[in-house]
Amino acid sequence: MLDLLYVIPREEFVPQQHRALAFSDLELPLEKGTKAGAGERMWQPKLEARVLQELALKRTDRVLEVGTGSGYLTALMAYRAAEVCSVEIRPALAAFGRGNLERHGADNVTLEVGDAARGWARHAPYDAIVLTGSTPILPQGFLDQLAAGGRLFAVVGEAPAMQARLVTCTAPGASSSVDLFETVLRPLANAEQPQRFRF
């Protein structure tokens, strides 16, 4: 799976000033390269590789990505899957990701601007869903939009206690999940919040 990180040149998706660090074990900032100003970051290469490994994408899979960012993970998934719908809430970041994807001929990607923090029913059902930001709780909308046998990767919880979770749709309305590892990830914009008790 790590070989795929070299098939699609990662450095070409990184803002110019950070290209020397493209394969470093770091989250690289995107905001200066995109003027999005939101403090967004590229995932570490090892996290990208782990997500691809866990999702085990097939040529027939339809994928939803929530949070396009640089477009690199989008391109990796598009290389493996039939089609990828990627939704980015920040127009400037969407433009940066779109430019990167177009330069690399990712013609099986649909990139849309919008708020998909609770799901994106437009192209559902999906065989795989990836949330590139964390969410305190996993919205039911994503589970409802998984096809039978579909897999969802999300980082769930609040800092400092977050879990990378893989959810599999076992039947309509039913799913199983496994917590893979602990990590900390920036939250999705407008992520669903748990109900808080007030006294």
Where are these regions (language model features)?
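Conserved nucleotide-cofactor-binding alpha/beta core module
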Residues: 52, 56-175
